[in-house]
C-alpha cells in the first residue's frame, strides 16, 4: 500500500521547499508531488546511479576496490588523518548541520584545513558581507511584500526551479495578492536566459562589467547624469528606467548568484551591490540575498562561524583557527600541492575543480564519504557510504536566507548504512585513540 509522507523538505537547492509529498511503498519511494524535476530526481533512484552500501578500500589507486567493514575503513581513515602533515577536509554542502559540528571538531583534532564548496561559489559574497554588511530579510518577506525583484547573474528557472513560483516572482503574498501582476522583474545577465525572457527590464550587461553597471546605477541614484550613451553595454536610458523603478518600489529585493561572485571583481562586485542596496534604503525598503546553490552550503558557513568566527577555509594547523581565503581554501591548497591527504564529504570536487587541483587529488590519499559513485570516488582510496540526509536521516539545514529548517526522514537507509554524523563520531573516537 502506498503511504504519503507530507510536508517533506527537499534536500537539493538552497530554496529548501518544505511542501513536498513523497509516495512510499515497502520502504521504496515510488513518486513525488510538488517537487521540481531536480527535487524529484533527488528522491527517485534512477537506473544507472550506483549506490554504495558497503565501505570500499584499496591501497593503490590503480587497483580494484575491495569490500571492508565500517570499522576497518574508519580506522584506516583515522590513521591517514593523524599521519598527514596538512590534511584537507572539504565538502559539507549536501549534509546536515550535526555532521558539520563533528567535522569542525575533527579538523581541530588533526590540525586540518576545513573548507566547503562556498570557496568556489559564494565565498566572495561572505567576504563582501564582512566588509560592508548584509541588508537581509527572509524569503517569506519577499513573497509577501516585494514588488520589485532583481535577479543579477542568476538564472533561477534552471538553478532554483521553484524559487520564482514559491517565494519571489509568481508567488501570491499577503500584500501581493495578484502575484506576477503586482511585481516588476529586472534581470541583469549577459545572455538572454529563460529567466531574462520573463523580465520587464533586461539589462544585458557585457561579461565582467558588473562593477561598472552597479557604479553607474549608484551614480544615477545620487543624482549624477551619465556622460555616455552606454555603460557596460547597457543603454543609459535603460539604466535610468531601472533605477527609477527601484526608487519607487514599496519593497525591493536583489537576488545575486555566481554570475556576479565568479566574474572579474569577485567580492568587490558584491561590495558595490550591497552599497547600492544601502543607498536605495534612503528612498525605500530594499534587501539583498545570495542564491545559495546546495541545500546546506549556508548551514556549514553558519556552523563554522559559530565555532571559529570564520565562515569557510579555516586552517587549524597551528592549533587555533586561521582564515585567509586564497591561502587556506581547498582549490589553492591542492593547486600548490600543499596538502598531503584529503577527506571529501558530501561534495564532488573531482567533477568541478580545475585540472591541476584534480591531478594533485589523484596523487594523495583520498577518502570519500559519499552515497553514490562520482568522479571523486573514482580517485578515492577509501569510500565510506552514508545514509542520505533529508531522505533516509533527519537533521537541520539552513535555507539561503539563513532560516534553519528541519529535514524529514522519509525511508530507512539500506541495512547497516550509517548517517554522516555517526561515521564522523566514530572517526573522532578513533583519532583520539591514535593521538
Swiss-Prot record:
Assigned protein family: Belongs to the FwdB family.
CDD domains per UniProt: MopB_FmdB-FwdB
Coiled coil: none
KW Oxidoreductase (keyword) present: yes
Keyword list, A-Z: Methanogenesis, Oxidoreductase, Selenocysteine, Tungsten
Domain of life: Archaea
Annotated InterPro entries: Formylmethanofuran_DH_bsu, Mopterin_OxRdtase, Prok_molybdopt-oxidoreductase
Enzyme class, UniProt record, top EC level: oxidoreductase
GO BP, one annotated term: methanogenesis, from carbon dioxide
Annotated GO MF terms: formylmethanofuran dehydrogenase activity
Subunit structure: This enzyme is composed of six subunits FwdA, FwdC, FwdD, FwdE, FwdF and FwdG.
Reactions listed under catalytic activity: N-formylmethanofuran + 2 oxidized [2Fe-2S]-[ferredoxin] + H2O = methanofuran + 2 reduced [2Fe-2S]-[ferredoxin] + CO2 + H(+)
Keyword Transmembrane helix: no
Pfam families per record: Molybdopterin
Pathway in which this enzyme or protein is active: One-carbon metabolism; methanogenesis from CO(2); 5,10-methenyl-5,6,7,8-tetrahydromethanopterin from CO(2): step 1/3
Protein name per the record: Tungsten-containing formylmethanofuran dehydrogenase 2 subunit B
Function: Catalyzes the reversible oxidation of CO(2) and methanofuran (MFR) to N-formylmethanofuran (CHO-MFR). This enzyme is oxygen-labile.
EC number: 1.2.7.12
Cofactor: W-bis(molybdopterin guanine dinucleotide)
Amino acid at each position: 500500500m502506498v503511504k504519503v509522507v507530507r510536508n517533506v523538505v527537499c534536500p537539493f537547492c538552497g530554496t529548501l521547499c518544505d511542501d513536498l509529498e513523497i509516495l512510499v511503498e515497502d520502504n521504496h519511494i515510488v513518486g513525488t508531488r510538488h517537487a521540481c524535476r531536480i527535487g524529484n530526481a533527488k528522491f527517485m533512484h534512477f537506473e544507472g546511479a550506483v549506490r554504495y552500501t558497503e565501505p570500499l578500500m584499496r591501497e593503490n589507486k590503480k587497483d580494484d576496490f575491495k569490500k571492508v567493514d565500517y570499522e576497518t575503513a574508519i580506522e584506516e581513515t583515522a590513521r591517514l588523518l593523524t599521519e598527514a602533515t596538512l590534511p584537507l577536509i572539504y565538502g559539507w554542502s549536501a549534509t546536515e548541520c550535526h555532521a558539520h559540528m563533528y567535522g569542525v571538531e575533527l579538523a581541530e583534532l588533526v590540525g586540518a584545513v576545513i573548507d566547503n564548496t562556498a570557496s568556489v561559489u559564494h565565498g566572495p559574497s561572505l567576504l563582501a558581507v564582512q566588509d560592508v554588511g548584509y541588508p537581509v530579510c527572509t524569503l517569506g518577506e519577499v513573497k509577501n511584500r516585494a514588488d520589485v525583484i532583481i535577479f543579477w547573474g542568476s538564472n533561477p528557472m534552471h538553478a532554483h526551479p521553484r524559487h520564482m513560483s514559491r517565494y519571489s516572482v509568481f508567488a501570491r503574498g499577503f500584500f501581493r495578492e495578484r502575484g506576477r501582476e503586482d511585481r516588476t522583474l529586472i534581470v541583469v545577465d549577459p545572455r538572454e536566459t529563460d529567466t531574462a525572457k520573463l523580465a520587464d527590464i533586461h539589462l544585458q550587461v557585457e561579461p565582467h562589467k558588473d562593477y561598472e553597471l552597479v557604479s553607474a546605477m549608484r551614480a544615477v541614484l545620487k543624482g549624477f547624469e551619465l556622460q555616455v550613451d552606454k555603460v557596460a553595454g547597457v543603454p543609459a536610458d535603460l539604466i535610468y528606467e531601472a533605477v527609477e523603478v527601484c526608487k519607487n518600489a514599496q519593497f525591493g529585493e536583489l537576488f545575486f548568484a555566481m554570475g556576479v561572485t565568479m566574474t572579474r571583481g569577485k567580492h568587490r562586485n558584491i561590495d558595490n551591490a550591497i552599497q547600492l542596496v544601502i543607498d536605495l534604503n534612503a528612498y525605500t525598503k530594499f534587501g539583498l540575498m545570495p542564491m545559495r546553490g546546495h541545500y546546506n552550503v549556508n548551514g556549514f558557513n553558519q556552523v563554522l562561524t559559530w565555532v571559529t568566527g570564520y565562515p569557510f577555509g579555516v586552517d587549524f594547523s597551528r592549533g587555533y583557527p586561521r582564515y585567509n581565503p586564497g591561502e587556506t581554501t581547498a582549490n589553492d591548497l591542492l593547486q600548490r600541492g600543499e596538502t598531503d591527504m584529503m577527506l571529501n564529504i558530501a561534495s564532488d570536487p573531482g567533477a568541478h575543480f580545475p585540472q591541476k587541483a584534480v591531478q594533485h587529488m589523484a596523487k594523495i590519499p583520498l577518502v570519500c564519504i559519499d552515497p553514490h559513485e562520482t568522479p571523486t570516488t573514482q580517485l578515492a582510496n577509501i569510500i565510506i557510504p552514508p545514509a542520505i540526509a533529508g531522505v533516509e536521516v533527519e537533521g537541520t539545514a539552513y535555507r539561503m536566507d539563513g532560516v534553519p529548517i528541519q529535514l524529514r526522514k522519509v525511508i530507512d537507509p539500506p541495512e547497516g548504512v550509517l548517517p554522516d554524523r555517526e561515521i564522523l563520531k566514530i572517526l573522532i573516537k578513533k583519532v583520539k585513540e591514535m593521538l
